[in-house]
């Protein structure tokens, strides 16, 4: 049913495709939740 028999083969193929770049740099466009002193987050969703 499936072409790949082991997850190691899949991981090797993904490493070859990605070039082991990973996510070392932070994305400036990524939205992050602001936390208060208690560690609770709050967000406002606005519909235009």
Curated annotation (Swiss-Prot):
Disulfide bonds: none
Keyword field: DNA damage, DNA recombination, DNA repair, DNA replication, DNA-binding, Metal-binding, Zinc, Zinc-finger
Gene Ontology MF terms: DNA binding; zinc ion binding
Gene3D superfamilies: Replication Fork Single-Stranded Dna Binding Protein (3.90.198.10)
One of the protein's GO biological processes: DNA recombination
InterPro entries to which the protein is assigned, alphabetical: NA-bd_OB-fold (IPR012340), Phage_T4_Gp32_ssDNA-bd_sf (IPR044947)
Physiological role: Binds preferentially to single-stranded DNA and therefore, destabilizes double-stranded DNA. It is involved in DNA replication, repair and recombination. Binds ss-DNA as the replication fork advances and stimulates the replisome processivity and accuracy.
Subunit structure: Homodimer in the absence of DNA, monomer when binding DNA.
Additional remark text: Interacts with the polymerase and the uvsX and uvsY proteins.
Name used for this protein in its record: Single-stranded DNA-binding protein
Organism: Enterobacteria phage FSalpha (Bacteriophage FS-alpha)
């Amino acid at each position: 049913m499936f072409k790949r028999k082991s997850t190691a083969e899949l991981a090797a193929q993904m490493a070859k495709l990605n070039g082991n770049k990973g996510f070392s740099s932070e994305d400036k466009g990524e939205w992050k939740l602001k936390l208060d002193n208690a560690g609770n987050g709050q967000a406002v969703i606005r519909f235009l």
